[in-house]
Structures are given as C-alpha cells and as structure tokens.
Amino acid sequence: MQTISPAFSCDLKSVIQPNLTAKKARYSHVNGKRVSVRCSYRSESFSFPNGVGSSRADWQSSCAILASKVVSAENSSSVAVVNGHSNGSVDLSLVPSKSQHNGKPGLIQPLTITDLSPAPSHGSTLRVAYQGVPGAYSEAAAGKAYPNSEAIPCDQFDVAFQAVELWIADRAVLPVENSLGGSIHRNYDLLLRHRLHIVGEVQIPVHHCLLALPGVRTDCITRVISHPQALAQTEGSLNKLTPKAAIEAFHDTAAAAEYIAANNLHDTAAVASARAAELYGLQILADGIQDDAGNVTRFLMLARDPIIPRTDRPFKTSIVFAAQEHKGTSVLFKVLSAFAFRNISLTKIESRPHQNCPVRVVGDENVGTSKHFEYTFYVDFEASMAEARAQNALAEVQEYTSFLRVLGSYPMDMTPWSTLPSEDV
C-alpha cells in the first residue's frame, strides 16, 4: 500500500503579521508552485469580554489559530528536524507571537517554540487541537474528551492533523458525522491521508441559539449567518423567528458570532452556541432553535500512537479498505459477511472515491468498454482488536482487499446525553 503523504507545513507568520486588507482567508498562488492560506480580516479595533484581544489580529495571536501552507515539492533541500527526525518535506516556520491585551493574557495562551516537543510528561497539560474558534462546538467536544486540557484552535481540519503530527498538539478532536447532516467527508479523507490513530470518540448534543448584539430585537434582523449545516438544522425555527431575513452561509458557527461582534452589526444575527454568546458579548434572542431535538455530532479523538485494546469494556474498531474486484463478484458482500458470521455488529459503513484510482475502465468484447467508479470503504464495528473474533474477521477481509488499514480500536462513548444545553455547549 502506498501511503499518501503530501508535503504539508504550518506557518504562523500570517497570524503574527496579518494582512488586514481581506475579509476572510484567501488562497495565493505563487508561480503555480505554492499555495498559502492567510487568515486576515478587516475591522476596526474592538474588544470582547473575558479579555479576548482588541483587534482581529490580536485575537488571532491570542488563540494561536494555525495557518496552513503547502510547500513546493522542489524545495527538497531544506531539511526540518522534529524531535531528532529529519523530514525534507516539512517547513517548520512556526514562531507564534505572545500577545496581551492591556497587560492581561488573552482567552487562550499563544503557542511558543517550546511546543515543538514530545508528548507531555506527568504533570504537563495536554494540548488538544480542534477546528474552529473559541465557542465552537468542537471546542466543547475537546473539553469533554480531555477535561482541563489546553485547547488549540485551528483554522482548517487538516491543520489540526498537522498540529498533532508536528508535536504542536498531543491530541486532536474532530467531527466525523452528525445525526442530521450525515458524514463529514473531508475528515474521512484526512484519516486516510494522515497517519494518526483513533484513540476514542465523544458525542455532543448540538444546541443552537439565535444571537445578536445587546438591545437588538428579532424584528430588526435582516440577515442570519452561520455554518450551512447549522442553518439547515434550524430552518423551521428561522422561518418563524425571522421570516424576512436573508440566510447566508458562514464558515463556522462561533466565527459568525465573532464577526457580528467585531463589526458591530445591529441588523445581523448568528446561529451559534450559548458559549459563543458569552465569549463575544452577544445576547440570546432565542434558545434551542434546532428543529430536531435529537441533533448529535460524533467526534473522534486522534493521537500519534494507538492505545492498547482491551476487553473489559465496550470497544469500537474503525478500518478502511479497498476491495479487489478480480477476486470475483460480490466482493463487498463477502467482506461484510466476515463480520456477520462472527456476530460482529457494524455501526457504520461509508464509501469514498479511491484517491489513486477513482475510475476503473473495463473492456469486454461483447458489450464494449465500461467505466466503474472505484471506492475505499470505511467501516466501524463493535469489537476490540484484543478479541480473537475481530482478528479472525480482519484476516478474512484481507483476502478480498487490495489494502486494509486499522484506523483505531478504542472505547465507545457510553455516556448518556441530554437534549438540554450543557454549560460548555
């Protein structure tokens, strides 16, 4: 199996010296060889409660939002060293700045160069990367998965993966599916591309609120912004609360709340969490506006090293494989039967286009040439890799696959959840 390992690197220079001429992250192409993502923003000076910076740039530095940069493969002469291991494809230009607001530390302490170190020893704070800004549901998931940890917000999903790989973070907590919106395909693709291991899962009830600046009434709202999934999950409530308001998609729920506060928008509301309202000084116009009370998002906990599977509690195992068509017909049926014959329950199966060979051309002298889409399959099943039945099932599955990889064997999240809002969501 050939591992997909593009030359990625993280760069925080755009956070240290932000370009305040753009409104959102933009992509710059340099001679067709390099793509960089700059987090930049236009706004006047402002201040949030709880000591969140005095400008967008200060806030970014305080939160240490990682900016990603794809480095040209031709730049193979520069060799970076991480914990004694050299890697010619990684550029460690990671020098985050320290920022304070009126002499006081910001909401989240910025990264320092000492963060490029091994996993914390006894007594050290665990560093957990998540995608989004403070107040996002991913932050709540990170807090539930690893209480008393140091949360590291990242601007993109793949940056969170890189943060763990480069020892900037010790864990990553990322969403993979929602009970209403379905799978988050981007993260499934990243699980295959990166070599991190699933070490746990956590489920978070999604409790949406309608937020606006203090003093703004619902009938004054002409625009509602939020993440597309949040807007879809609150469509019925928004039609009743703000029937004349325009609905606009935003890249993140908490970032939508931050945007309203930063630009002092009295005609705009955001769909976000109650914590986002607290962080950015907004009022809650309506609480619990999700159309379905059973709205839950499942997050995976990722680490550089796998955990040791056990049998003293319910475990779940996640795998990814590609079927071998030359093994005959009904290959997928044979693969899934390996679990059924051993009384192993499947909790999820997801297909994604094969990254190396998305289309297979088949020629037949009788019917002509046909094209078939090639897929990789992600499967979750309820068994621990410490069990003989799971090992035997995968041994049989391997007979019908061109590649098979165990993404992780980890404890199931068995904690009951409530549709009522929690303190951290």
Swiss-Prot record:
Induction entry = Strongly up-regulated during stem elongation.
Q: In which tissues is it expressed?
A: Expressed in roots, leaves, stems, flowers and siliques. More abundant in stems and roots.
Give the catalysed reaction(s), semicolon-separated: L-arogenate + H(+) = L-phenylalanine + CO2 + H2O
Entry function:
Converts the prephenate produced from the shikimate-chorismate pathway into phenylalanine.
**What is the protein name for this chain?**
Arogenate dehydratase 5, chloroplastic
* Keywords in alphabetical order: Amino-acid biosynthesis, Aromatic amino acid biosynthesis, Chloroplast, Lyase, Phenylalanine biosynthesis, Plastid, Transit peptide
Q: Where in the cell is it found?
A: Plastid, Chloroplast stroma
Q: Where is the Prephenate dehydratase domain?
A: 127-304
Q: Where is the transit peptide?
A: 1-38
| Associated pathway | Amino-acid biosynthesis; L-phenylalanine biosynthesis; L-phenylalanine from L-arogenate: step 1/1
Q: Recorded GO terms, molecular function?
A: arogenate dehydratase activity; prephenate dehydratase activity
Organism encoding this protein: Arabidopsis thaliana (Mouse-ear cress)
